[in-house]
Amino acid sequence: MNEDLTEAIALGHDLGHTPFGHAGERALNKIFSEGFAHQKQSVRIVEKLEKGGRGLNLTWEVRDGILNHQLSGNPSTLEGKVVRYADKIAYINHDVDDSIRAGIIREEDLPDTYTDILGHSTRERLNTLIHDIVNQSKDKPDIQMSEDVEFAFRGMR
């Protein structure tokens, strides 16, 4: 695992986000005839806008990881797959935490179908997700989750 590559992908993967996050992205997607995707905008920023229009001298592995970091994407490298999972783990847990803090939901409102697998607190969920990925990926040519954890993870979205 190349930590520098993982870090470069992680640092660049969300550069193209719009104001108001995914809601802003959906609004721009309706306006532009060719659509709008923040991951494509992130690549555009690092390839064309940085350094006065010269772009950054990034490897294809970094650009591929930035472009394919969404859960539906398929990064070509293990490092890109690590960032893809890390991004979604953070995103889902932040959304749950924000919803609880805002009083929209309570921790006990989360479906038992998912929390019985992942855990009933943010700390438990993070621990389960990270350990599952490490255990399922150790000595294998891919980064992956077990079926039951992946089911619960996708359900929490």
Language-model regions: role of each:
Residues 1-37, 43-46:
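Acidic/His-rich, divalent-metal-binding segments that scaffold phosphate/diphosphate chemistry
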Residues 1-4, 36-157:
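Histidine-centered, transition-metal-coordinating active-site segments
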